[in-house]
């Protein structure tokens, strides 16, 4: 495996785990709106959503870190990465980009309007949704990870 691909994968995975663990808990200026997030979900729900969202990514990242010195990662680990980040890519399409670009989802649009009110956005609103900058960056990390997985 090319070292740059391995380090790129480890770096992107680490960023995504940090994002999943912290983005609903740590103030990030105009990149987040913690008051709106806490107003739409209870602390208990937020805790469990954070844990359950981060767990698969944290586990596969941890195993990749254990194998970081290996010349080539085991096939089972590569498969695990594909399942994890393939699901993440499908999830971003279903939750964000499909409703933004292709189909209307009024309930989702209203939820996003409340949760991400006042956050930084640079894309125009479509179908009632304007993806916030922080999630766009996260989605780019997911896409980057999938691209690097094709180079394993």
PLM region spans:
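Hydrophobic transmembrane helix segments
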Residues: 15-51
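Core segments of alpha-helical transmembrane spans in multipass integral membrane proteins
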Residues: 43-66, 84-86
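C-terminal halves and exits of single transmembrane alpha-helices
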Residues: 82-103
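Interfacial segments of alpha-helical transmembrane regions
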Residues: 2-14, 67-88
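Alpha-helical transmembrane segments and their membrane-interface junctions
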Residues: 58-73, 139-152
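Hydrophobic alpha-helical transmembrane segments
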Residues: 52-57, 120-144
